[in-house]
Amino acid sequence: MKKKTLVPLLVFLMGICLVSLVVYNTDTHEKEQSRTTAQLNATTYGERIENEIINGIEITDVLKQLLISGTGEINQFDTIAKNIMSDSVESVQLAPADIVTDIYPADGNEAGKIDLIHDKERGEISIYARDHHTIVTQGPFELKQGGYGIAVRNPIYLKDENGQEYFWGFTIVILRVPDIFSDATSALSKFGYEYSLSKTDNPWSDNYKIIYQSDRQLTNPVSYDFTIGTENWKFEVTPENGWENNTLIAVISVFFIAITMLLVTLTRMWLVSKENKNKFQILAHTDSLTGIY
C-alpha cells in the first residue's frame, strides 16, 4: 500500500480511537453528574414527602397526649381537630375499641364510621398495629366517602387505675392523595424528572406496591428510602430524557470527527505534495535526452 494512502489511514484510525475515548469519558462523566444531581433531588423531595407523612403522624400523637391527659376522653374534639388540620389532611378520626366514632369534618365522612378490626380490608393490618404497638399506614384506597387517601393509624395504650396498660383504640388521620405529594412531585416535573413512590404492601411483607407515580416508566432510577412505623417506603427518580446527554455527545462526536477528517485530508495533501516535489527534483536533475540523473 502506498505511503500516501497508508499514513492517512493510520491517522484516521488513531483519530477514531481518540474520538471514541473522548466520547466514552464524556458520556461516563455526564451520567455520573446526572445521577448525583438526581440523587440529590430524590433525597430532597423524598424527605419532603416523608415529613408530610410524619406531620400526619404528629396529629395522631397530639390526640394521643390529649387522651392520656383526659383519661381516655377528648372534650370538644371537633374544635381541636379543626385547629390541627392541614391542607393535605382529609379527616381526623378517633376509634375507641377499634370502632371509628368521631370524625372531623363530619360532613361527607359518615361512611368512615366503621369497625376497623372486623372490616375486610382494614382488619388484618389494624390487628397488627394493635398487637405490635406500631403505627401503620394503609392505602391509597378509594374512600367510602369519596376520593383517595392514605390512612395513618396510631394505636393508643392507656393505664387503668391499677397502672395496668390496656389498648384504648386508634387515633387516625386520613391524608389526601395526591395532595400530600403535590409540592414535591410538581417541582420534580418542572425539573424534568419522572418519579415513583412505593411502600411495602404491609408491615410483614417485603413486596412493594406503587403509591403514586408519573406517567412514564422509570429506567435505572436513583432512590431515597425511609421508614414509617415498621413499613419501608421508596421514592425513585429518573430523568425524563434518560441518563445520557445525547445532544452533547452528538456535538462532541461531530466536532472531533470533523477534526479527524481535516487531519486526514491535510496529511494526504502533504504526502502528495511531498511526492510531487520529489518527482520534480528528480526531473530537474535528470538529463532530458539521456534520462541520466
Predicted regions and their residues:
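Signal-transmission coiled-coil "S-helix" linker that connects upstream sensory/regulatory modules
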Residues: 274, 278-281
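Juxtamembrane extracytoplasmic/periplasmic/luminal helical "stalk" adjacent to the first N-terminal
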Residues: 11-72
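N-terminal membrane insertion elements
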Residues: 2-12, 16, 20-27, 214-274
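Intrinsically disordered, low-complexity polar/acidic regions
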Residues: 68-232
